[in-house]
Design a protein with these regions (language model features):
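A glycine- and charged-residue-rich anion-binding loop/surface
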Residues: 1-426
Length: 426
């Protein structure tokens, strides 16, 4: 970022903010400078007075327009720096010394003000529902969404979240008017029970904002009455660090959209199930699915048992073992179940099974009781054989598996496993 020096048109110590009372103001540029970042140029303007709120206290800055007789220039952001309110524009006015009319975007300001007031109401509701240990740890207020970080030791329950929503919406319906004291002393604020941020440094005079029983020290913009918020809805609650939780919420039309979306989803589910009683239909579907799953599992086990009987019957014992060494396209679950089924039927079993799943080779070795009694270890066998398919594995003395990267080496791994076992069987 390349920032030029300020061009001063007339001296100014700090910006006069008039945005609590008006969204339109006659202004003059006191100083300006050019900023270049990533090849893009913007300009920062400081007015003698301004209705634009500068990004601070968790609330994003206003956007809007500055107008003169000859031009209209969008204000794309407003920041605050060293007591100055800085307006970001993408072009410098033709005549910086002219008088301008500064106009805040009223819809964006109202939406942000509604969300800021809703944040205060939620803060109070959280303390009522969770306890007085709740303290603000951070916040973000935009026209679209509000975010509030607070101290709490565990995840909030659905019932607690519902209680917070109900308390906030009760305050919204009560339509509490904004009561503010811009010249309150810290002592007066303490007597009123105003919420103060821990570690925050306050001046001799503070701005105290009240909506019903919610009282906080705050420099942000607020709605004129809680009824303007319309409706409050929590989107989610999560942990951001040890002992700190975060709630994201929306108000007004955005909150309504959340409800409409949920209703649409329920309607789609109801139509899909052909049943207006969604919960009962879903329960019935799960019960039916569970019963079908049990039937399928029973059939699968029977199939595995039949397959095992067929393999045993067609595999004669040779040199003291029943050797089964093949490749299969069966799933790993089927291969494992088959291996255990074969072991239960053949005490002299040597099963070396290879398969490829999702392009990756897998080797399975199962040994009968009489084979492991001779000291043959399936885990040691697969570890050595798997090297031929660029893999590794292990397991128990009687059962082990290995995975690899090279399916072209699977047959060689099978042959190696048979060779290693054959060398140890007496």
């Amino acid at each position: 970022v390349d920032t030029d020096d300020w061009v001063e048109l007339f001296p100014i110590r700090e910006s006069i903010f008039t945005g609590y009372d008006t969204l339109t103001e006659k202004v003059r540029i006191a100083r300006y400078r050019r900023v270049t970042s990533k090849g893009k140029t913007s300009y920062q303007l400081v007015f003698d007075r301004t209705p634009f709120y500068g990004n601070s206290g968790g609330q994003v800055g206003d956007i809007g327009m500055i107008e003169s007789a000859n031009e209209r220039i969008p204000v794309v952001a407003t920041e605050k720096e060293n007591g100055l309110i800085i307006h970001i524009v993408n072009q410098l006015p033709e005549n910086p010394a002219a008088e301008f009319t500064a106009r805040v975007d009223p819809e964006k300001r109202q939406a942000a003000a509604n969300n800021h007031t809703a944040t205060h109401l939620m803060h109070e509701a959280l303390r009522k529902v969770l306890g007085a240990h709740v303290e603000q740890k951070g916040s973000l207020v935009t026209p679209e969404i509000l975010r509030f970080d607070f101290s709490h030791f565990q995840k909030m329950t659905p019932q607690e979240l519902r209680e917070v929503e109900m308390l906030v919406n009760r305050a919204v319906r009560a339509n509490y008017p904004l009561e503010e004291n811009r010249e309150a002393t810290k002592e007066e604020a303490e007597k009123c029970g105003a919420m103060m941020l821990f570690g925050e440094k306050y001046g001799d005079k503070v701005r105290m904002v009240r909506f019903g029983s919610s009282v906080e020290l705050c420099g942000g913009t607020h709605t004129s009455a809680t009824g303007n918020i319309g409706f409050f809805k929590i989107l989610n609650e999560s942990a951001i660090s040890a002992g700190v939780r975060r709630i994201e919420a929306v108000t007004g039309e955005r909150a309504e959209q959340i409800i409409y979306a949920a209703e649409d989803t329920m309607r789609d589910i109801s139509d899909y199930l052909h049943n207006p009683q969604v919960l009962q239909a879903v329960k019935k579907m799960f019960e039916s699915n569970e019963a079908l799953s049990k039937e399928v599992e029973t059939m699968r086990r029977e199939q595995v048992a039949q397959w095992a009987d067929k393999i045993i019957a067609s595999t004669p014992e040779r040199r003291g073992v029943q050797l089964i060494a093949t490749q299969t396209d069966r799933t790993p679950e089927f291969v494992k179940d088959l291996a255990y089924c074969l072991r239960a039927r053949a005490p002299k079993l040597v099963l070396v099974q290879g398969s490829v799943n999702d392009g990756k080779p897998m080797l399975t070795v199962m040994l009968g009781e009489e084979i492991t009694a001779q000291g043959v270890n399936a885990g040691a066998v697969v570890r050595e054989a798997a090297k031929l398919m660029q893999g590794g594995g292990g397991g128990q003395a009687f059962f082990a598996t290995a995975g690899g990267k090279n399916p072209d080496g699977l047959q060689a791994a099978i042959d190696k496993a048979v060779e290693l076992i054959g060398a140890q069987v007496k």
